[in-house]
Regions:
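Hinge/cleft segment of the Venus flytrap/periplasmic-binding protein
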Residues: 138-143, 230-276
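Structural recognition of the beta-strand scaffold that forms the well-ordered cores
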Residues: 27-29, 54-56, 76-81, 95, ...
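Hydrophobic alpha-helical
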Residues: 46, 55-70, 136, 151, ...
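Flexible loop/hinge segments that line or gate small-molecule binding clefts
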Residues: 56, 60-100, 111, 117, ...
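Short beta-strand elements in bilobed, periplasmic/extracellular small-molecule ligand-binding domains
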Residues: 19-31, 117-122, 140-159
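Hydrophobic alpha-helical segments within soluble ligand-binding/sensing domains
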Residues: 38, 94-118, 130-131, 159-163, ...
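Extracytoplasmic "Venus flytrap"
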Residues: 1-18, 22, 27-44, 48-50, ...
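Short, solvent-exposed amphipathic alpha-helices that sit
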Residues: 7-24, 101-105, 128-146, 161, ...
Length: 276
């Protein structure tokens, strides 16, 4: 989606290391969260007649028209870290267990509070983000946990977008118990806004990624938890699938990368300086 998120930098590094070691070339394009730009980039790869396209869809539905062109051109496609709406258009999928990521955060919250007012930071065009928030909400609802939804704020998963949006919410109400963010960058933006209002110690903030920055905030007791993904495993499994497809070997249609919840209770078991 954007290399502005270090998570995707790590995935790219893992893939690039293997590709270059084999004497091949990895061309990386950053769509900067623009679905139209991403579609143009895919079509550019089709024109170049590349051997395979790895896609992290900005908009899981809008990318379909470009993927149809790739399929018609006979170019295999692997969806990386997020699903596309029409899965028949891709040859393989490597994705984290995003629903479980949200569910794990919800289960942790239920251990700590009996009810609460929750602000959600969302990204409705991205399936991974959709599934995380869905997993969180449905887990609470199935358990009968009482919560008030303060709002679903569209933030593109970006720190620089989420911070002013949360600042704006705080001008209208400071009655917030929990912030649930689709990823760690948006959680960091929320925490910056809360900290400016001296509210961070009173609000439980949940994210997803397991970034070094989030783990450090958890260690400092300033963030509650992050559902940790593994960009290293995602990158390795993607490139493994890539070369199997190019060799004409069978691959499992979807590889699910497990997630682990990192909280104040277990953060010391993880490296604060690196990724999983």
């Amino acid at each position: 989606m954007t290399m502005n998120n270090p998570y995707f930098e790590v995935i790219n590094e893992e893939i690039k290391a293997v590709v270059e070691n084999k004497g091949d070339v990895l061309e990386t394009r950053d769509s900067a969260m623009d679905a139209e730009v991403q579609s143009e980039q895919v079509e550019g790869f089709i024109d170049e007649k590349v051997d395979c396209i790895l896609i992290n869809a900005v908009d899981w539905k809008a990318i379909g028209s470009s993927l149809k062109k790739a399929k018609k051109a006979g170019i295999p496609v692997i969806a990386v870290d997020t699903l596309v709406y029409d899965q028949s258009l891709v040859d393989g999928i490597v994705v984290s267990d995003n629903y479980e990521a949200g569910a794990q955060c919800a289960k942790d919250l239920m251990k700590r509070k009996k009810k609460g007012k929750i602000l959600f930071l969302v990204q409705s065009e991205n399936k991974s983000a959709i599934d995380r928030i869905k997993g969180f909400k449905e887990t609470l609802e199935k358990a009968g946990w009482n919560y008030e939804n303060i709002g679903d704020i569209e933030c593109k998963g970006q720190l620089e977008v989420s911070q002013p949006l949360v600042e704006n919410v705080l001008t209208k109400t400071k009655d917030i118990d929990v912030v649930v963010a689709l990823n760690d960058p948006s959680a960091m933006g929320a925490m910056a806004a809360l900290d400016a209002e001296h509210m961070l110690s009173d609000v439980l903030v949940y994210g997803a990624d397991g970034s070094p920055e989030a783990k450090t905030m958890i260690y400092k007791n300033r963030m509650m938890a992050t559902a940790a993904q593994s960009p290293r495993i995602t990158g390795k499994k993607t490139v493994e699938m890539l070369y199997k497809i190019l060799a004409g070997k069978p691959v499992e249609s979807q590889y699910i990368v497990p997630v682990r919840l990192i909280t104040r209770d277990n953060v010391e078991d993880y490296s604060l300086s690196g990724w999983q």
